[in-house]
Amino acid sequence: MKNVTKMKIFRPVNVVFEAFVDPSEIGNYWFSSSSERWEQGKTVTLRYEEYDAQGEINIIEIKDNKKVVFRWGSNEEGHLVTISLHALDNATIVEVVEEGFNDNDDNLIRNIVDNKEGWVYMLTCLKGYLESGNNTLRAALVKG
């Protein structure tokens, strides 16, 4: 099953692309830090200082200003995430497609909804940062 989330951001596609792959940008809207620039074949460590948590992603594919594909977890397990960028006039449509959900999981719907919430939140933070310079939205979501 696929989880698809899209958002329109009023910034050029190259600016949006750099926000994902440049470690100096990611802390303004998503993770606290990224261990290095996202490049095909690399394993990148992402950290959330606020939650004392970190994880690794494997960068599967990069097409400059068009697409970033990565896997959360091991190469054989976990979720495959494709972030596609589509230029539209003076804006960029960001599309996040997450695959790898277990269709037989009793918590399938809850997992999809939780992850969808996360992608919508990340894209909202990205939009606020790139369009208005607001970098205080990140890590402000309260669950529970």
Feature annotation, model-predicted:
Residues 29-30, 72, 119:
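Signature tryptophan residues that serve as conserved aromatic anchors
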Residues 9-11, 50-52, 63, 74-76, ...:
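A generic beta-sheet turn/junction motif
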Residues 128-144:
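Short, highly charged C-terminal tails/helix-capping segments
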Residues 17, 120-123, 127:
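Non-transmembrane alpha-helical segments in soluble domains
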